[in-house]
């Protein structure tokens, strides 16, 4: 059962933000998210943390500049998700502009699995590279880097995943989460790390006079890729990431984007001039990810690197078809998961582990996320892998760091996990199929130790009541222009309403007419058909509804409770 709670607001911070000219509601919302001064809301690129603060970024830049000068062959080895694809495309665009001889390789997840493995090194060696550059992977590739070294191939690792006990012996490792790195933003996505390396490389090339007599490549032109990868990877939107995403969205809205990004907006039926974080995370990101989930992410990367508008649209349509196929597979898996969950005492457990031999390896992460959202339990979903192995993808709730939890499982049950890695909120692992039940029990034991009853109770966190006078289109438009996402959630308000009317629209949604404080407003409940009582307490967000060129205010109801009056 979910309960509505209100975020505390530091009044001193709120008052300071109002004095500095912020709208009173925006000031309250920002103060509740830890913002205390106007400068933390501004999005100027000049406010970014400098590349010199990122450990080994300058060392990587020197290695890359030397390789460019020597005409060495570079090969980017990418991860197969949206973050990896955008990081690869950004690197390809930037390095090509800098005069590098560069190509890319993305492992097929079904054949090779994740990361720079020795098998991938053998495959990469066919292109005769002098230098491998990992993007969004590599921090755990100890054996892969050794395999490359034995072949005389240098490796630069750019990654953001949490390091293990042993680091690969790469020529340079750039990762804000490695020991000794004082970079303040630990939440850079893989594409963000690669962007910073390219900034450092441009500075190094400038120092060497490489741009003498010609225009420097404008890395800001790649911020659309950076915004897409950052939002799609669901990394926390701290100040640095908000600046990067905001600047990327501004360029998209102004029509300054890669042809592939333009094409993805087209197949999603969205207007890029009104681009939002929602578009990047829920519409473009899934279409790119569909390539890595069901086919080969090379298709997604080609979409992002091509400069041919027609080719970009052709690929985007293929990605759209793959995404539709993914939805069908996901729906079938969800039905099967519901059958498995019906046999479990989910309410009495602290975790959920699910496995079905028919499940698709590329879709288990989405399934785990859906189950986690519905039941508010850290969840792993598994599908068959190679030979006698199964591969799982997990999603967690606040209070349980998923990678740390897996590390604890591995220490308590040596040999149980074949391999694992990830973040606080998401992780992946491989184990033997025969060990699934043993893993489920071990993970449950760890979750029971780490989670309190309070953390297992779902809470709908809101920004409190909104004065009726602020139920207007202007505020909805103001909030829509801000950057919201992981760690900096979109405002959700809570008030009591009288329900004047409700009807089903689009077969699975409900449209409502609500009244509060003498004001009548339209609202929507998506994917909900049950009728509301005459009075409700609702958690809602303001949205801008556009129809036939006219914009109106519309509330989106996220949660409701009966008021008792």
Spell out what each predicted region is:
Residues 85-86, 143, 239, 293-296, ...:
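Short helix/loop capping segments that flank catalytic or ligand/cofactor-binding pockets
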Residues 9-130, 151, 203-435, 465, ...:
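Hydrophobic helix-and-loop "lid/oligomerization" segment in the mid-to-C-terminal part
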Residues 30, 133, 289, 479, ...:
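A residue-level signal for conserved active-site and pocket-lining positions in enzyme catalytic cores
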Residues 66, 165-175, 261, 514-517:
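Acidic-glycine-rich active-site phosphate/pyrophosphate-binding loop
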Residues 122-191, 195-211:
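Active-site cavity-forming subdomains of large catalytic enzyme subunits
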Residues 66-70, 309-354, 387, 400, ...:
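Mid-to-C-terminal polyanion-binding domains and interfaces
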Residues 143-147, 367, 474, 478:
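A short acidic, amphipathic alpha-helical/loop segment
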């Amino acid at each position: 059962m979910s309960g509505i709670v209100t975020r505390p607001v530091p009044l001193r911070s709120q008052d300071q933000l109002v004095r500095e000219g912020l709208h009173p509601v925006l000031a309250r919302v920002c103060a509740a998210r830890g913002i205390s001064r106007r400068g933390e809301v501004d999005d100027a690129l000049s406010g970014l943390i400098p590349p010199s603060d990122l450990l080994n970024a300058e060392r990587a830049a020197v290695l890359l500049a030397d390789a460019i000068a020597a005409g060495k062959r570079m090969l980017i080895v990418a991860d197969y998700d949206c973050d990896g694809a955008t990081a690869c495309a950004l690197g390809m665009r930037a390095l090509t502009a800098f005069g590098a001889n560069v190509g890319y390789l993305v492992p097929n997840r079904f054949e090779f699995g994740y990361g720079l493995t020795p098998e991938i090194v053998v495959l990469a060696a066919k292109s005769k590279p002098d230098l491998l550059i990992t993007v969004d992977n590599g921090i755990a590739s100890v054996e892969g880097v050794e395999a490359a070294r034995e072949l005389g191939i240098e490796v630069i690792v750019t990654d953001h995943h949490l390091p293990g006990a042993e680091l690969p012996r790469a020529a340079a490792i750039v990762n804000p989460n490695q020991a000794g790195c004082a970079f303040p933003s630990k939440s850079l996505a893989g594409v963000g790390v690669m962007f910073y390396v390219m900034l450092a490389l441009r500075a190094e090339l400038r120092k060497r006079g490489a741009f003498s007599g010609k225009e420097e490549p404008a890395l800001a032109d790649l911020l659309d890729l950076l915004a897409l990868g950052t939002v799609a990877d669901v990394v926390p939107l701290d100040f640095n990431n908000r600046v990067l995403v905001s600047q990327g969205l501004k360029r998209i809205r102004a029509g300054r984007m890669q042809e592939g990004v333009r094409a993805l907006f087209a197949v999603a039926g969205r207007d890029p001039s009104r681009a939002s974080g929602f578009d990047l995370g829920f519409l473009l990101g899934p279409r790119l990810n569909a390539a890595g989930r069901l086919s080969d992410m090379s298709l997604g990367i080609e979409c992002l690197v091509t400069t041919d508008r027609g080719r970009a649209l052709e690929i985007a349509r293929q990605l759209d078809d793959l995404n539709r196929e993914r939805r069908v597979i996901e729906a079938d898996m969800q039905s099967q998961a519901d059958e498995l969950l019906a046999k479990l005492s989910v309410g009495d457990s602290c975790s959920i582990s699910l496995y079905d031999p028919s499940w698709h390896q590329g879709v288990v992460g989405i399934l785990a996320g859906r189950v986690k959202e519905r039941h508010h339990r850290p969840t792993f979903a598994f599908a068959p892998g190679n030979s006698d192995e199964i591969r799982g993808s997990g999603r967690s709730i606040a209070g349980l760091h998923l990678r740390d939890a897996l590390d604890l499982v591995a220490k308590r049950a040596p040999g149980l996990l074949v391999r694992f890695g990830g973040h606080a909120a998401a992780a992946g692992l491989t184990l033997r199929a025969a060990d699934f039940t043993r893993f489920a029990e071990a993970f449950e034991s760890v979750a029971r130790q780490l989670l309190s009853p309070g953390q297992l109770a779902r809470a709908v966190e809101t920004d409190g009541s909104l004065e009726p006078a602020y139920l207007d289109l202007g505020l909805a438009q103001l909030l829509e222009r801000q950057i919201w996402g992981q760690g900096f959630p979109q405002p959700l308000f809570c008030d009591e309403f009288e329900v004047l009317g409700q009807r089903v629209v689009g077969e699975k949604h409900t449209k409502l007419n609500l009244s509060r404080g003498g004001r009548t407003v339209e609202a929507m409940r998506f994917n909900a058909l049950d009728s509301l009582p005459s009075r409700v307490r609702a958690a809602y967000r303001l949205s801008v509804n556009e129809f036939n060129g006219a914009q109106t205010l519309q509330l989106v109801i996220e949660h409701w409770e009966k008021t008792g009056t």
